[in-house]
C-alpha cells in the first residue's frame, strides 16, 4: 500500500516510512497536485483537511484522520487498512526522501562514516537520492522501543 501525506502530516509520513511503507510527503503542494499524483500513482491520500472532500475523483483514495497526534494517526492508518507492519520492512526507506535504502558492505563505508560508527556497527545502508549512509544507531533502538510500547506491531 502506498500513501501520500498532505503538508500537515510530516511526522506521520516519517513513521510510515520507518515501518517500511512507501509514503510521499510534499510541503507547499496544491490540493489539485496532491490529488492528481495520488490518483496517477494509486496512492491513498492521508489528510485532516476536510476540503479535500470536494475532489470527487479522490473519494476512494482519501482517508481523513481524526487525530492530530502522529502516533494516534499512525494507529488510525494501520487499523483502517488492516496493516500489520513486518519487522523485516522497518528502516528500509530513507526517512527524508522515501527512497528504498541499499545495503552496503562495511568496507565500502570506511572514511565515509565517523570512525566510532565504523568500529561499532556492522550493517550500513545507503540512500542514493540523499547520498547519505545510515546505520542502526541508538535512534533505531529508541524507535523500536517506541513502536513496541505503542503496540504497533
List the predicted regions and their residue ranges.
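Short cysteine/histidine-rich zinc-coordinating motifs and their immediately flanking basic loops
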Residues: 106-112, 139-149
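Short, glycine-/small-residue-rich phosphate/pyrophosphate-handling segment
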Residues: 92-93, 105
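Short cysteine-rich clusters marking metal-coordination/redox-active sites
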Residues: 94-97, 127-130
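Surface-exposed, charge/polar-rich loops and edge strands
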Residues: 152-153
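Short functional micro-motifs and their immediate structural scaffolds
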Residues: 99-103, 135
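Long, charged N-terminal interaction/targeting segments
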Residues: 1-89
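Short linker/helix segments within small regulatory modules
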Residues: 111-124
